Amino acid sequence: MTLQVCIMTPDRIFWNDQADEIILPTNTGQMGVLTNHAPLITALDIGVTLIRSNSNWNPVALMGGFALVKQNQVTILVNEAESAQTIGVDEAEIAFQEAKTKLEQSQGEKQRVEATFVFKRARARYQVVKQLGV
């Protein structure tokens, strides 16, 4: 038995396929989902989700949202999703380093919140390309 995983963004269905396992970046840490998981709804943080299908792990950068797990179906609603194939390695690394520097230099609450958002997004994209070894 497998999971049916569907990742939806506001403008398209990003992923709709079966998987053996999925690891979600929730607001309280990573959460793994296997078949026959208890039903739940969880908020998703900006981060990397890992989808295992046929012994292959597929990393996907998710930009925050929600996940519903019910009856071996995982429905993920996110603001944006990106795979390693659509992210330039050099671009992701430069954006990550710039975001890290900006976060370290941020002053004041508003600037820190904005810099943290940009950093999390850049880190997720960078982790996706690094995990796939592109």
UniProtKB/Swiss-Prot annotation:
Membrane association type: Peripheral membrane protein
InterPro entries cross-referenced by the UniProt entry: ATP_synth_F1_dsu/esu, ATP_synth_F1_dsu/esu_N, ATP_synth_F1_esu_C, ATPsynth_dsu/esu_N
Keyword Hydrolase applies: no
Source organism of this protein record: Chlorella vulgaris (Green alga)
Family: Belongs to the ATPase epsilon chain family.
Protein origin, superkingdom: Eukaryota
Function recorded in the entry: Produces ATP from ADP in the presence of a proton gradient across the membrane.
Pfam families the record matches: ATP-synt_DE, ATP-synt_DE_N
CDD domains for this protein: F1-ATPase_delta
Keyword Coiled coil in record: no
Protein name per Swiss-Prot or TrEMBL: ATP synthase epsilon chain, chloroplastic
Compartments reported by the entry: Plastid, Chloroplast thylakoid membrane
Keywords: ATP synthesis, CF(1), Chloroplast, Hydrogen ion transport, Ion transport, Membrane, Plastid, Thylakoid, Transport
A cellular component term, taken from the record's GO annotations: proton-transporting ATP synthase complex
Gene Ontology terms for molecular function: ATP binding; proton-transporting ATP synthase activity, rotational mechanism
Subunit details: F-type ATPases have 2 components, CF(1) - the catalytic core - and CF(0) - the membrane proton channel. CF(1) has five subunits: alpha(3), beta(3), gamma(1), delta(1), epsilon(1). CF(0) has three main subunits: a, b and c.
